[in-house]
Amino acid sequence: MSCQFVLAARRVVQFPPGMAGNVLRGALGSALRGALNPEDYAHIFEPAAREPGAIAGGPSGLSNWPRPFAIRCAALNGRILQPGDRFCFVVHLFDLRNSALDHFTQAFAQWAQLISVEQASVTVDLDARPSPVSRIRVEFQTPTELKSSDGDAKDFPVLLARARDRVSTLRSLYGPGPLEIDFRGVAERARSVKTVRSELRHVAVERRSRRTGQRHGIGGQVGFSEFEGDVAEFLPYLEAASFTGVGRHCTWGNGQIHTKILTPEF
């Protein structure tokens, strides 16, 4: 589900460059902690992997489960709001079995004046496209960090693996179950897709934890990469990733991607 929140500032609100997601993180966390019981708060804001192997068919080594939402707020970066100024952002919700939208609405209404909430159902067909596609461009619209010893955002197998695994994990925890696919086979076929053009730059951003005082890097690569090969099978995962985000800190607005189908160059 995609939800657009429109609010008006009650006081001066600053969104430093690259930090809009962190500002919303602080506001949402404080409001939810005060409004919800510990169990509901943990489910939304601090889901922990309580049982080994609980995510069947998904990636191993998860010490914390992904949160059941992703915020899209890049347009707020660098803005300074005065009292009464309107602003908006989008929250993609992945857990529709609980009252997450009500909790979010209550929390943001405590932080600012709530004007409206518009919601729309989102469905992505994960079946391969029927028509062949041989060249695509993936735009990394917000800083994207893909942790891998095998490569980074310009390497298609790495990008595809992160997008596929995030979709499967979210389905396992909050939806109908993990992807029923041959993960190894998908990975093998993804290796045949080659990077033919890449214009990426690194954006350095840090946030300071209020709880520990430590600084954490939340930057990543922005720009685009173009890939060539038999990519029709993989497009649904990339389309889903445009809603879920991909890579580190995608809950807070990082890892926002958009995929375009290109005409092959001969």
Language-model segment annotations:
Residues M1-F266:
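RNA-interacting cores
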